[in-house]
Structure formats: C-alpha cells, structure tokens
Amino acid sequence: MIKVNVFLLDVGSTFIKYMVYEPSLKAELFSDSVPFPMPLINDGVHYEISEEEIRKIIYRIFNTASEKECKSAFICAQMHGYLLRRHNTFGNYISWRDNRGDTSNYRLTNVDFSESGTAIKKNSPLASLCTYEESILAESEFFTLGSYISFLLTGKNITHKTDACASGFFNSCTLEKYDFFDNLVLPSVLDKVEMIGKYRGIDIYAPMGDHQISFLGSGAEKKNAYLLNIGTATQISTLA
C-alpha cells in the first residue's frame, strides 16, 4: 500500500494548528500547534498583526510539511481579516477583531449585501477600506489571509469562495466582483477547492474559510440544522 501523507492546516485566531494525515490508514501521523502572533496594535479600535511574523510561521510550518513528505496540503483560515500590498510591500494583517470600519460610507448605503454571504459591520474588510484614501487603494492589492497564504506558497493571490466572500467584495452565488474602489486589485476566487500550485513538491489547494469548514465538518446538511461553533469567537449559524 502506497502511503500518501496529507497536510492539514488551520490558521486560527489564537492558535495555528496543523497535522499530517494518512487517508488510507485513516490515521493522524503527526500534529502540533503554535500561537498566532500577538497584535502590534490593539487600542480598542485597531487590531494589527505583523505580516512578517505570520510569514515566518507559515514557511516554518510548511518546511515541516516537506520534512514529513506530505504530497498535498489543505488550508483553512480565519475569515474577515485582510492585508494590503502596495508597491510590492505588505502592510500589517488587519484582523477580524479590528473595528475601524465606516459602515455608513456612501459606497455601502445603497447596496444589497444579501448575496455577498456576509453582513457589513465595523470589522468587515469592505467597511474598513472605506477609511483609506482613494489614492492608496488605487495602488494596492487586497488579500484575505487565505489568499495571502496562497501567495506565499504559490505566488498567486487566489482563494476559495468560502474565504473570499467574507470580505464583502464578491457575490457568493455568481462570484461577481463588486467594484467599490477603482483599480484596487482583488484575489481570484475559485468555486471549487482546486490545486493552485506547488510548494517544495507539495500540491497546494485553495484555502477555505474556517467557519465554513467547521460547518462542513459537522455533517449538518439539513436547512433546519443549526451549528454552534465555539472558538476564539463563537458563532451560531444555519444553512441558507
């Protein structure tokens, strides 16, 4: 029997958890976790984390995946956070705990977000970006945490719809982009969990949103089923 080690990564808000799984044996061969970096800025409104610290951890973890001879990697990441890349330089990671968003901004007041898959709140990336100057956004590229990890590993700003739609920039049914900001570059979005590239011989699959994955893993398939997910933040949700 040929063993095919699969690497599973969950980038949470308190811990980053990872494991090596062997499907034919249905066995966990290795697992570990590291704390998610502490914020550089946490003043009650702004919550920013060093991009460099996140990058170092991701590369260190995937070096472990390579050492464990993993053939493929599946990733889920905390939703609603983002990074901006301007002039080839990344800014800090703006966490979902950040509350700088301008929900009353004129761009958002006449838009029906019912098909975006998210509600616009002060911690929403879309509302947060309304506080930036247009000239800055016109020179920037937007990344979810998931698409940022894709970029580190494959050079592509790409992610799965369960991660991308939490930003508020995409219609969750059609994946159509909402063009709120001129020239702001957005991630490419995949409808299916597909391989997007390789890192050190490992097939990297499009990252997914962690809350969406918790629902999938629960096995709840009926529309009248509710899921209580207790993590760093707690959510209660049902299928639409």
Question: Where are these predicted regions, by residue range?
Answer:
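Short coil/turn connectors at secondary-structure junctions
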Residues: I2-V4, F90-G91, L137-S140, L184-L186, ...
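N-terminal glycine/serine-rich phosphate-binding loop of ATP-dependent small-molecule kinases
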Residues: M1-G91, I202-A206
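Short acidic-glycine loop/turn motifs at beta-strand connectors
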Residues: E22-L25, R85-T89, L153-K156, C173, ...
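Residue-level marker for buried hydrophobic side chains located in beta-strands
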Residues: F7, S95, H160, P207, ...
